[in-house]
Structure formats: C-alpha cells, structure tokens
C-alpha cells in the first residue's frame, strides 16, 4: 500500500491494467451486482436535479422505482446506493439499439443538459473507495464482467490509475494525482 496524505492506495491500482471495452461487455457493470452504485450524500440532490433532463431516457420500470422509493436507498451494508430495477439494473441505465447499456446521466452531461457527470463511484470504477476512520482506501475491484477491459488494458499497457485519471482528479484533486503519478514512476524503477 502507498499513502498520499490521508489516502491509502493499493499497489494494484498502479500495477494492474484496465481499459473499458464497452463493445465487449455491453455496460454490464451498470446491470449486474447485488445493489446499486455507491452514492455520496451530497450527490443525492444532484441525482434528483438531473431527473427532468433524463426522465424520458429511463425505462418505465425505472421511473416507477424512482416514483416509489426515490433515486437512492440504503443497502444491506448500510451504504447509500442508486436505486435498482428488479434487483439488477441501476435506475439510470438506458440501452442503445445494439443492446449496449449506458448511463443516462452521463449521456445528458455529454449533450450539455446537466453539469453533473454521474456519481463519482461510477466514474471511478473499477476503483472502490473505502473509509477507515481518518483514512480513505483506494482499491482495485476485480469483477468477471470486466475481463475484456483487463485484456484491453494489458494489450494497450494502460494502468488502472491512468485509465481513471479524470475521476481520480475529480475525487482527490490534481495535486494528489500528481503525487500518485510520481509514486507510480518510482515504483516502476524498483
């Protein structure tokens, strides 16, 4: 583990390779799992604010879930997560004509309809952030649905931290990310 300030980073974030391959996985990370995506408390209001911009993109089932329970719920572990449809799809998922799943919030952001990109936990995947008292832990999460992303990352030689540069800066800031890059370069020399 590597420590930068009060943030502890798994060496896997620096060593392992990853590059999303949406053509291969079809956005399965937004579908599979036993709960929705982790959400920070301050993101709930943003999720509610973006609803008018994405409402027509959402499935009727997703709209019904949102009407019944809201955009988030507390899962079995006590974490705030996005609401899900039929214990599977995130309520913010949409599908294109090829059956590929994508995030309606990110689509609205790219179209200039909102200034909210999507929950930071989604943006950071396959990194998961854990809280341990005064420290945050940055860990690489391995999941079978991302095998194609691992293979593409290996082929293109893209480490997890480089693939996730933008969301890591969004979460921890540019100075922190610059320190992470220095640490990664030093680690390569060893």
Name each model-derived stretch.
Residues 1-190:
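Short loop/turn segments that flank or connect secondary-structure elements
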């Amino acid at each position: 583990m590597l420590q930068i300030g009060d943030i502890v980073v798994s060496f896997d974030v620096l060593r392992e390779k990853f590059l999303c391959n949406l053509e291969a996985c079809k956005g399965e990370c937004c579908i599979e799992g036993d709960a929705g995506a982790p959400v920070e408390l301050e993101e709930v209001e943003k999720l509610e604010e973006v609803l008018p911009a994405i409402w027509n993109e959402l499935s009727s089932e997703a709209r019904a879930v949102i009407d019944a329970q809201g955009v988030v719920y507390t899962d079995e572990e006590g974490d705030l997560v996005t609401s899900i449809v039929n214990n599977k799809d995130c309520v913010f998922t949409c599908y294109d004509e090829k059956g590929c799943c994508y995030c309606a919030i990110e689509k609205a952001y790219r179209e200039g309809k909102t200034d909210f990109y999507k929950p930071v936990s989604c943006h950071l995947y396959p990194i998961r952030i854990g809280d341990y008292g005064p420290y945050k832990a940055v860990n690489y999460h391995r999941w079978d649905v991302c095998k194609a992303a691992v293979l593409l990352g290996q082929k293109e030689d893209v480490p997890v931290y480089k693939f996730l540069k933008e969301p890591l800066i969004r979460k921890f800031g540019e100075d922190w990310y610059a320190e992470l890059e220095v640490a990664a370069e030093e680690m390569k020399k060893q």
